[in-house]
C-alpha cells in the first residue's frame, strides 16, 4: 500500500444514545500477536506515540488501518497493522479498554508513568472544573444529536411506504451474483463519518481506496438505504462474504449507511446531506422510491432542515469542547517527561521487530 492510500475509519462517535464505542473490534487474539492499550490523561502523548509507531511500520510498507478520533480527527484513537499482527489503542474514556488476556495478548502501556503528579496536583482546582465543562459540552452535543436523530428517524419511518422493494431486491440479486466467489471472512464494524469539530467529517477516501466499483444510493430520507443495505448485509452474511459494515454515526447501531466488500472491491454507499460522494464515475442506483405526496414531503423537508441545524449546533458544542480540551492538555504536557515516552517508543519498536 502506498503512502497516499491510507485507510481511515472511526470506532466511536457521539450518537443519539451518547458515545457508543466499537473498540472491541480491535481485539483479535487468535489471529494477531499483540494489542497495546495506552492509558493516561489528555496531552500525555498517546496519539503522538501511535503516530510515531505507525510511521515506522508504514515506512516498512505494512498494511495499516488508522482509527481516528471523532472529537479531534487529527488525533488517532487506534491503529491496526495487519502485517505485524498488532494493534494499538487509546484505552481511556470515553472508549475504556482493559486487557482480557493480560500479558499473553494485550498489555497496558501506562503513560501516567511519564508525568509528575505534583505538577498536576498544583493545578487541581483548574483541571477539575475544566474537565467537567468539557463533559457538559459533549452532553449538550448529544442532546442536539438525539433531537436530530429523532427527526431523521421520523422521516425514515414515513418514507418507508414509498420504497420500491422490487427494485431493491433486483439490485441485491444482481450484486450478490457479482459477490459470489469473494473471499469469506469475519464481519467488521466501523464508522466512516462523525459529528465533529465545527463540521461533520466523512472519510470518503477510504471507500475510494478499497473499491473498484462504488454503487451510490441517493437517499435524503433514509428508507431506501435502510431497506437495501439491511437486506444486502443479511444476504452477504448468509454467504459468509467478508464485509465492512459502516453505520450511520448518529444512529449506531440502528442504521447501516455503507457496506464495503474489500476482497470484491465493491462498495454500496449512501449519499445524503451528511456525506456526499464527489466522484462522477460512481454508479448511482436509480428508481428506488415512488413519488412521495407533496404534503408529506414538505413536512419531511422541515424535519430535515431542523435536523441539519441541530447537527450544526452539535458540531459547535464539540468545537468548544475541543478548544477547552486543548487548554486541559496544556497542564498535562507541562507535567510530562517526554524522554520517558521516547523509551516506551523504543521498547515497543524493539518488541514489534
Model-assigned labels for residue ranges:
Residues 38-39, 49-52, 57, 65-70, ...:
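A cross-family "folded-core" feature that marks the main globular domain of proteins
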Amino acid at each position: 500500500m502506498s503512502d497516499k492510500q491510507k485507510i481511515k475509519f472511526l470506532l466511536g462517535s457521539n450518537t443519539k444514545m451518547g458515545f457508543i464505542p466499537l473498540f472491541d473490534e480491535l481485539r483479535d487474539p487468535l489471529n494477531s500477536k499483540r494489542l497495546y492499550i495506552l492509558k493516561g490523561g489528555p496531552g500525555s502523548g498517546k496519539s503522538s506515540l501511535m503516530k510515531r509507531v505507525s510511521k515506522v511500520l508504514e515506512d516498512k510498507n505494512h498494511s495499516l488501518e488508522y482509527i481516528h478520533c471523532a472529537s479531534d480527527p487529527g488525533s488517532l484513537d487506534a491503529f491496526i497493522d495487519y502485517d505485524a499482527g498488532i494493534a494499538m489503542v487509546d484505552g481511556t474514556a470515553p472508549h475504556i479498554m482493559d486487557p482480557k488476556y493480560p500479558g499473553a495478548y494485550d498489555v497496558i502501556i501506562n503513560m501516567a508513568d511519564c508525568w509528575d503528579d505534583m505538577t498536576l496536583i498544583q493545578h487541581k482546582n483548574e483541571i477539575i472544573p475544566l474537565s467537567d465543562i468539557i463533559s457538559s459540552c459533549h452532553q449538550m452535543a448529544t442532546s442536539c444529536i438525539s433531537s436530530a436523530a429523532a427527526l431523521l428517524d421520523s422521516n425514515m419511518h414515513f418514507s418507508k411506504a414509498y420504497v420500491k422493494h422490487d427494485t431493491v431486491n433486483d439490485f441485491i440479486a444482481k450484486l450478490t451474483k457479482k459477490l459470489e466467489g469473494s473471499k469469506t471472512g469475519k464481519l467488521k464494524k466501523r464508522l466512516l463519518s462523525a459529528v465533529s469539530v465545527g463540521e461533520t467529517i466523512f472519510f470518503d477516501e477510504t471507500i475510494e481506496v478499497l473499491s473498484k466499483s462504488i454503487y451510490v444510493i441517493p437517499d435524503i430520507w433514509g428508507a431506501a438505504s435502510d431497506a437495501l443495505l439491511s437486506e444486502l448485509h443479511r444476504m452477504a452474511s448468509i454467504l459468509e462474504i467478508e464485509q465492512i459494515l459502516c453505520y450511520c454515526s448518529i444512529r449506531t447501531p440502528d442504521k447501516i449507511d455503507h457496506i464495503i466488500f474489500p476482497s470484491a472491491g465493491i462498495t454500496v454507499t449512501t449519499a445524503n446531506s451528511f456525506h456526499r460522494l464527489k466522484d462522477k464515475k460512481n454508479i448511482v442506483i436509480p428508481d428506488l422510491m415512488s413519488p412521495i405526496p407533496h404534503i408529506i414531503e414538505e413536512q419531511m423537508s422541515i424535519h430535515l432542515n431542523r435536523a441539519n441545524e441541530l447537527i450544526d449546533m452539535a458540531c459547535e458544542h464539540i468545537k468548544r469542547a475541543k478548544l477547552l480540551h486543548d487548554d486541559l492538555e496544556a497542564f498535562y504536557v507541562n507535567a510530562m517527561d517526554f524522554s520517558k515516552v521516547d523509551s516506551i517508543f523504543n521498547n515497543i519498536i524493539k518488541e514489534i521487530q
